[in-house]
């Protein structure tokens, strides 16, 4: 299987969007010439429109951000170029000890705590989001490759947790018991502060697979981060 994962992310402006499309044009050009037996694309849950109910693989792909537009466009480019089995994995927010992104959430909170800096939340951290362990994403990629699966699959646990709760969990695990503070919100909450998922398709596709709980994943990330330092 060929796994397509490279992207300049998160895509924040038109220039980044153009570069990401150009990147995929190079990939699809190569795939057109040499058709692999199986292609897996790592996309994003950002392709979905906001919803008050749990999102699933059949939910409307109507992105409200350039990041979502970028991934949806790249999905369509691959569908046009790949003649064999194509699997599209759409992870929600990913966390892990070695994750290179310092985005708002578990990764940033853990690094701030390690540096002895207070954790500043957006608003009071009341948004509730799903977070998936990077090892679970890797595990799903391996299963998809082994089974030569095709179609769309979300990578999301089905459990939402507020950012304040996540910050409290991180601090409880850390050596530095830093302060957690709210801050004035500078705009509307992303996704209206709530983005749940229905993980039923994962269980149907891979019955033996189970997602890591947030508590276990944060504990493992903390241990791995400490060992690396």
Protein language model regions, located:
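C-terminal substrate-binding subdomain of Rossmann-fold SDR/epimerase-dehydratase oxidoreductases
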Residues: 117, 122-125, 129-229
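Active-site proximal helix/loop that lines the substrate pocket
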Residues: 8-11, 44-47, 93-99, 126, ...
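Active-site beta-alpha turn of Rossmann-fold NAD(P)-dependent dehydrogenases/reductases
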Residues: 7, 40-44, 64, 90-92, ...
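Active-site helix of classical SDR
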Residues: 66, 70-73
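NAD(P)-dependent short-chain dehydrogenase/reductase
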Residues: 76-128, 134
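Conserved Rossmann-fold NAD(P)-dependent oxidoreductase catalytic core, especially the SDR/UDP-sugar
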Residues: 25-66
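Hydrophobic positions on the long internal alpha-helix
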Residues: 23, 27-31, 77-78, 140, ...
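NAD(P)H-binding glycine-rich loop region in Rossmannoid oxidoreductase-like domains
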Residues: 1-22
